[in-house]
């Protein structure tokens, strides 16, 4: 019964996705020495200074899709996003995930609402559709309904907990726009696979049409990764954003 005493936050509505790099072992040199062990054995020198030959090797590996050398770079991200984004993210069974638990802690009343840049109207059939701007009336209705339902659901959640109902049962009432937090650990090869389908770029060999919210998440991750492994990222771009 004490769990009902731990609600200290007022409800918050946000329109952003946050991504933070927690730790990493990721550099372009990881790719180089991992690949060269194939021909040089234990005589591979590990260095962060890349030669033109090293950069050429990275490009070759990407172009010919020799992927395993890209698996030796790892990154751990802390991500805060609405639950529906995580459900899409975790379809990529190529990373390690640990998420905030609604069984073991009271969930905070932080909810996602789209900003005014979010296109609202779907035109066309599944697999061949596009999104267009909605009207101000549609946007106003959406935000009003989302806020009202989010607050009502959270009030019910608190009442259920106050009556002694277990967290893992009470959480069933909460909506998908509730924010959660997770840690994701992923290697560079798997990350490129994720980016190839969760971002939309004109230079992609295979065009993808991700939901806007997970693309916002992917964009932030890619910007961090680009800073860690710029030559690998450049090769990824050059080869049409196809994961090796």
UniProtKB/Swiss-Prot annotation:
A motif (ThyX motif) lies at residues 91-101. Gene3D superfamilies: 3.30.1360.170. DUMP binds at residues 88-91, 99-103, 171, 198. Its cofactor is FAD. The gene is thyX. The keyword NADP applies. FAD binds at residues 68, 91-93, 99, 187-189, 193. Pfam families: Thy1. It comes from Tropheryma whipplei (strain Twist) (Whipple's bacillus). Belongs to the thymidylate synthase ThyX family. Catalyzes the reductive methylation of 2'-deoxyuridine-5'-monophosphate (dUMP) to 2'-deoxythymidine-5'-monophosphate (dTMP) while utilizing 5,10-methylenetetrahydrofolate (mTHF) as the methyl donor, and NADPH and FADH(2) as the reductant. This is Flavin-dependent thymidylate synthase. GO terms for molecular function: flavin adenine dinucleotide binding; NADPH binding; thymidylate synthase (FAD) activity; thymidylate synthase activity. InterPro entries: Thymidylate_synthase_ThyX (IPR003669), Thymidylate_synthase_ThyX_sf (IPR036098).
């Amino acid at each position: 019964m004490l769990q009902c005493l731990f609600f200290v936050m007022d409800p918050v509505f946000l329109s952003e996705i946050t991504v933070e790099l927690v730790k990493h072992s990721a550099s372009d040199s990881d790719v180089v020495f991992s690949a060269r062990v194939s021909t040089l054995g234990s005589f591979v020198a590990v260095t962060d200074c890349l030669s033109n030959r090293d950069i050429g090797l990275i490009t070759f590996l990407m172009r010919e899709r020799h992927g395993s050398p890209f698996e030796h770079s790892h990154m751990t991200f802390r991500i805060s996003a609405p639950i529906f984004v995580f459900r899409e993210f975790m379809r990529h069974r190529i990373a390690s995930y640990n998420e905030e638990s609604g069984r073991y802690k009271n969930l905070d009343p932080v909810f996602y609402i789209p900003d005014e840049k979010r296109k609202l109207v779907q035109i066309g059939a599944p697999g061949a559709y596009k999104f267009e701007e909605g009207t101000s009336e549609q946007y106003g209705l959406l935000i009003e309904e989302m806020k009202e339902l989010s607050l009502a659901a959270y009030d019910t959640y608190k009442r259920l907990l106050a009556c002694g109902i277990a967290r893992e049962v009470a959480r069933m009432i909460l909506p998908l726009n509730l924010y959660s937090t997770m840690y994701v650990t992923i290697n560079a090869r798997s990350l490129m696979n994720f980016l190839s389908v969760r971002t939309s770029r004109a230079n992609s060999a295979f065009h993808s049409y991700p939901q806007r919210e997970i693309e916002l998440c992917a964009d932030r991750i890619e910007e961090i990764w680009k800073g860690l492994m710029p030559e690998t990222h450049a090769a990824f771009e050059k080869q049409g954003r196809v994961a090796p």
